[in-house]
Amino acid sequence: MSFLVLPLHHSNETQSSSSALEKSIPEKDLKKPYQLLSKNQFPEKCAVCKNAAIGYHYNVPSCNGCKTFFRRTILNGKRFICMNHKNCLDEIESDESQRLCKGCRFARCIEVGMDSTAIRASVKTVEGKYLLEEVLRKQKNRKIQMQQKDNFLSLIIKQLSHLEDQIEKLHFSTIPDGFEDMRSLSEILLYNPVFDSSRIPNLTPVSNKAPKLICMTYMHSALLAAVEASKTFEFFSKISHEARMILIRHVSLIGSNMMSASFSMHHRKSDELLLPDGTVFGSIGGCLASEVLGEIKYKNQLQQILHAFLRINVDRVEYMILKAILMRNPSVPGLTLDDQLIIENERNQYAKALLEYTILHHGVLSGPARFGSLIAINPIIETQSKKQKDVYVFMKTLSAQRECSHPPKSLFDEVMDS
C-alpha cells in the first residue's frame, strides 16, 4: 500500500535545472540497448516486478508497466510513500494482475538502475525537475558506493589470487628426494609461511628406504599448503598458539580437499578427482583405504566436493572466496568466545565479498540465490572431511597388522586424528 504525497511548491520556480537536464542526448546514443541485440533476444524477467520483460528500457530489463510507471512518475514529479515496511515487492509473487505498491515500485526502479536521463520527453513541471535532480543525486551516490564495493572486491580477489598461486606450488609438489617432513603442526606454526618445498626447514633424512605411496606424498603436501596458507590470515597474529592449533587441525583438510577439487575442475577440466601427476584419487594399488572399502566406494567418498563444484559450475573466483570463508570457521569446538569473534569478523568480510561477486555476475535478482547455492556446499565439504577422518581411524586399527605407508607423528596423522 502507498499514498500519493502532493509535491511541495518551491518559491523559486525559476531555479535553473541541472546540467544533466539540459544536456541533449547524442545521436549515437539514441538506440536503446535491446535494439542492439540480435532479433528476439530479450531478457526473461523485469528487474523491478519480476514479471515477463519486453526488453531493455532506460538501460534495465523491464516490462511495459514498470517502464511507463517510471517515466510517468519522473515527468509528473509525483512522490509516493510506502505505508508498510518498504519491502512490499520482496513479499509478493510474480503476478501481472496484482496491484503494486507505488512507493516500493519507484524505489526499486531507482535501485536496479533505471536511467532517468534516458527519458526523451522534457520534464516541464517544477516538481518533476526537483524529483529528477533528487534521483540523479541518489544514482550518483549509488555509483560511488558501487565503485567502493568494486575496489573492495577487486582487492580481495587480487590477494586471494596471489596466495593461490603461491600455495599451488607447494600443493602440487613433493618433499625433496631422500627427506621426509616429520614436523608436528605446532612446530610448523612457529615458522613464517614457506611455499617452496625445497626451503622447508628441519626435514628428516629418510631412514626407511622402502618407497612411499605417491598418494601419501601428495596428501602431505596438500595439507602443508593449507597450513601455510592459514598463516597469512589477518587474524592469525591476534589469536593464541593454542587457538591456531585447534582451528588448523579442523580446517586444513577442508582447504586441501577444495584445492584438489579446483585443480581437477579448473586446471585439468576433469570430472574425476586427480592427483597432480594425473592419477585418479583412490585408484592406486596398495592404498589401504581403497583395499578395505573397495575402490569404487572410496573414490566416490573422495569426489563429493568435486561433484558439488561441477553440479553448480563453481568458477575460480567463487572457489577462492568460498575456501577463504570455510577456512575461517569460528564455530570449531574448543575456541574461546574472543577467538570466535575475531575469526568471525574476518570471515564476514569474505562472505560480503562473495555476495557482491555473485550479484555482480548474476544480477540483483539471481545473485543472492547463487550465493546461497555456494554456501550450501559447506555441509558437503564438512561431511567429506569427517568421513575421511573416520576412514583414517579405521585404517589405523588395521595398520598394526600390516606394513602401512603412513608416517607416524606427522602432520597428516595429527590432522586426521583431530
From Swiss-Prot:
DNA-binding region (UniProt annotation): 43-121
One GO term (biological process): regulation of transcription by RNA polymerase II
InterPro entries, sorted: HNF4-like_DBD, NHR-like_dom_sf, Nucl_hrmn_rcpt_lig-bd, Nuclear_hormone_rcpt_NR2, Nuclear_hrmn_rcpt, Znf_hrmn_rcpt, Znf_NHR/GATA
Keyword vocabulary terms for this entry: DNA-binding, Metal-binding, Nucleus, Receptor, Transcription, Transcription regulation, Zinc, Zinc-finger
UniProt-listed PROSITE patterns: NR_LBD, NUCLEAR_REC_DBD_1, NUCLEAR_REC_DBD_2
Gene Ontology terms, MF aspect: nuclear receptor activity; RNA polymerase II cis-regulatory region sequence-specific DNA binding; zinc ion binding
Function: Transcriptional regulator. Plays a role in modulation of lifespan and immunity.
Full protein name: Nuclear hormone receptor family member nhr-209
Upper lineage: Eukaryota, Metazoa, Ecdysozoa, Nematoda, Chromadorea
